[in-house]
């Protein structure tokens, strides 16, 4: 059978941070994060300890494989004129972004989708840098897909389910969290912050949630980062007399280190010390509404730009 030349060959290249698949991968992973500079023994042991506490690896790699597979099915159902292939590449673990990109020249169109819905030109730049030698007018980039209606719906459903587990008489404060970014002179993160605020406000409005705060987590140890920190917000919530803190990690797309350790271990410990109950809303992980939000970003970019 000859190939139908009227069918466009569309590739969606999904980019994410990546995560070590085992403790043996931690050193190489950490070295790449540090732009080729080897971590000290103390730094390496600290990161290994975190992975050991969450079972030796995060769920990111397994979960994103499922998300990518579901995204391909969703897009193929929507794009009758195309044969859709969705491939995945990582920033700090194999398969690396540049290695995957060099194999995509035979596609009619390549659409690049960052797993972070709240992208800006600045935040996306480090993901796109390895692609520059391969990009041409057949490549399109989804810069931000936080406006996808089902992104808010995905969170609303899981927050609603979580609220049903709270005991009668609980007084919860809701803390939406996202990854902090370093503050640098002349650089604005307003687009990132505003995208997160809109999603937070959408969730709060749909569920009529009072007492909702956006807090920044997982900051580095050097320089100044966005505030308020999740540590400071948790401290204040305790001082205000709330019995429960409900964390909604809207800045993340699946269960990984920043959720399993930075929230489930560190914030849980802090809540217990303050006499509060720790509650976390489940991550998008295997939520089909979240996959539809990813597809929205791809379709909006692909069809809008022709």
Q: What are the residue ranges of the model-derived segments?
A:
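Active-site-proximal alpha-helix that buttresses catalytic centers in soluble enzyme cores
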Residues: 2-306
